[in-house]
A protein has these predicted regions:
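Short, charged/polar, Gly/Pro-enriched secondary-structure boundary elements
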Residues: 48-54, 111-115, 198-201, 263-264
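Amide-forming acyltransferase catalytic core, primarily the GNAT-like/NAT-type
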Residues: 96-98, 107, 117-211, 248-249
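Vicinal oxygen chelate
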Residues: 1, 7-16, 59-146, 190-191, 238-339, ...
Length: 339
């Protein structure tokens, strides 16, 4: 397995009301604005090692515009670009951007835009931002949920297996697990990673006709108690829980989901395990094994099938592909005990 990418560094979101979203991420999430330009606001968590991990720009509808990844080295960046171009996809180079150096941007076969770079500005808090612990980029946030860092992003694609295969074969993502329907062999969810985490890229099945959609992105907190506290803080400030708190079977991470003011879905998670097996082969999970709900005693809300930007069909569907499974594919985890 070729090792080209190191980690997810930031996501760029479009929001109809930029300032409402910025206030939410500052006050309820506990992020800090680092920069403002004419067309974007940049924010970071206290434990993010780089200048920012969230960029918010104006858009008519909520959307994931870009997901950015740091390469393993300067040579790996060149190799990644070469391998993308070899598949017939034409990307573009940019000499520098705010907070990082030369980057390669491309739109993948399912419509999702990625930016790859190597050179990056490390964040070192000064004054009241400085931590008393030398390894921390800044002191722990006193505000809101206060996640340590950005964790992962989950997109929606019309063919989960094909998406995973392309990113694995082209860019070296490790495929960690699949959720497959018990009959028909249709994959409704797959997780991939660039490192030892259970995943930093997830894929749900998309039955809409709109390419490049995303389901959510996630923040990391240190402990389960922090996650439960996050639910308390959010609900006390008028942000309801969409799903959770609970635990996913795949990855064994504690989770909760909610929406930001643009309606884009956000997850907070913690726990789970690291996988260091270099020749790992992904297992096929079935829903009854608790792939989505570790406890096998709940059901996923139908709203969780919505991806962004909105389209003519929910994200966990491929209606009509196999007669008799339409409802399963619209929400694979709707049955009690599977969600």
């Amino acid at each position: 397995m070729i090792k080209l990418l190191n980690q997810l560094t930031h996501v760029r979101l479009a929001a109809p009301d930029v300032e409402a979203s910025v206030r939410f991420y500052e006050e309820q999430i506990g992020m800090r604005v680092t920069d403002r330009t004419d067309d974007a606001v940049y924010l970071r968590n206290w434990g993010d090692y780089y200048r920012y991990s969230l960029v918010i720009t104006h858009g008519d509808e909520p959307a994931l515009e870009v997901m950015a990844w740091r390469a393993q080295s300067a040579e790996a960046l060149e190799e990644a670009a070469h391998r993308v171009e070899a598949t017939g996809i034409a990307g573009s180079w940019r000499e520098s951007s705010l907070g990082h150096g030369r980057s390669y941007t491309f739109t993948g076969p399912f419509g999702h835009t990625m930016e790859l770079f190597w050179e990056v500005e490390r964040f070192h808090g000064e004054g009241e931002d400085a931590s008393s612990y030398p390894d921390r980029p800044s002191r722990r946030s006193r505000d809101g949920v206060a996640p340590r860092s950005l964790d992962h992003v989950t997109i929606a694609a019309s063919d989960v297996r094909a998406f995973a295969a392309w990113y694995s074969e082209t860019l070296g993502f490790r495929i960690m697990a699949h959720t497959t329907l018990e009959h028909g062999g249709i994959s409704v969810f797959t997780v991939l990673t660039t490192n030892e985490k259970s995943h930093d890229l997830g894929v749900v099945l998309d039955g809409s006709s709109r390419a490049g959609r995303a389901n959510h992105f996630a923040y990391w907190v240190d402990a389960r108690e922090d996650l439960l506290r996050a639910a308390d803080i959010l609900m006390e400030n008028g942000t309801p829980m969409e799903y959770g708190p609970s635990i996913h079977g795949i990855g064994e991470q504690n989770f909760l989901y909610f929406r930001d003011p643009s309606t884009f879905r956000v997850e907070v998670n913690t726990g789970g395990y690291r996988n260091y097996v270099p020749d790992w082969e992904a297992y096929e999970w079935h829903r009854a094994q608790g792939s989505n709900n570790f406890y096998r005693n709940g059901q996923m809300p139908m709203s969780m099938t919505e991806s962004f930007p909105p389209a003519d069909g929910p994200s966990a569907t491929e209606e009509g592909i196999l007669p008799g499974t339409e409802n399963e594919l619209i929400n694979p985890f709707a049955k009690h005990g599977q969600g």
